[in-house]
C-alpha cells in the first residue's frame, strides 16, 4: 500500500547545480524503480541553517513528495544517509496529516457559527431617560 511522504534533504552549499541535479535524479530513479511515484520535486534554494551541520552554516534545500511503501522509503533514507553530499534529511508521512486536517475541517464545517444563529430573545429597549429639567438661574442684582 503506497503512502504519501515528504522527503526534505539539505545538500552541501558548495555543490554545483549539476551535481545537485544528479543527486535528485538518482533519488527519483530509486523511487520509480521501487514502484513508487514522484508527486513533485521542489528546489527551495540556498538557506541559512539554524545551527552548524557538518561545519556548514548554509545548505541547499530540496523537497521531494512521493507515493511509496515502507521498504522503498527505508531504501531512500539509506541512500540519503550514505550520500556524502547530503548533510541532513527528514522523511514525514503526510497521509496521516491529511486525514487529521480533513477531520478538523469537517468538525469546523459541522459547527454553526454563533453569529449565524438568530438571537433567542431580542434585547428589550431600555426606557428613555427622563428629560432633564432646566434649572432656573438665580436673579442677579
From Swiss-Prot:
Protein family: Belongs to the bacterial ribosomal protein bS6 family.
Domain of life: Bacteria
Annotated protein name in UniProt: Small ribosomal subunit protein bS6
Keyword Ribonucleoprotein: yes
Listed Low complexity bias regions: 117-141
Job description of the protein: Binds together with bS18 to 16S ribosomal RNA.
Pfam families: Ribosomal_S6
Keywords, comma-separated and alphabetical: Ribonucleoprotein, Ribosomal protein, RNA-binding, rRNA-binding
GO CC terms, sorted: cytoplasm; ribonucleoprotein complex; ribosome
GO molecular function: small ribosomal subunit rRNA binding; structural constituent of ribosome
Recorded name of the encoding gene: rpsF
Record's keyword annotation contains Plastid: no
Region of interest: Disordered: 110-141
One BP term from GO: translation
Organism placement in taxonomy: Bacteria, Pseudomonadati, Acidobacteriota, Terriglobia, Terriglobales
TM regions (residue ranges): none
